[in-house]
């Protein structure tokens, strides 16, 4: 078979396959719910991140300090390009971790009214619970994020410690956004470019988030806003 004939045969097979897949869209996935899937987190790659260590299972080829990555797909968003997100929901989390000196690791999530939260002490930059474990106050921004190929998906952009100042500023900007009528913009009515910048103090250097509002609402961003609205409604209902 010559190359031209082989190419035509391949195209026909591909066309038939495409038709079959379209006709069977979603088949076999009926029993998979949100509880059965892992929500991706958006994180920054720092100097000691495992994503930079070639002998680590979490290593990502091509990753560099300051890049942002998706914890599920392992997609990298380069530092100066970043990722576009539309916020959908915000919530505070109070998370308990073992200290690294004790082995480290997540212990549990505390309720916002847990009395232990009001009984913490400071040891340098670490906030300690009465039992000696670390309390990490976290801002979780549920967002719709856009991948490099244009696909969009729910993600969690969580911020803690030095990132909290960025989160508070972002919340302030979202809370001050207005519609032409002067009414308050819904949380999913704005889109943002998330990149990173280098910060430093007497304890070292690290990368932190930088968020810039996108004023040009393209059809792609409109789609993200609609998805973010659906996400907000689902989360609000406990779905």
Task: Explain the meaning of each model-derived region.
Residues 110-121, 168-170, 183-188:
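Short linear motifs at secondary-structure transitions and domain/linker junctions
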Residues 142-177:
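Short acidic, glycine/tyrosine-flanked loop/strand segments centered on an H-E-D-like triad
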Residues 137-142, 153-155, 185-192:
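Generic beta-strand structural signal
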Residues 172-239:
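Long, compositionally biased interface segments
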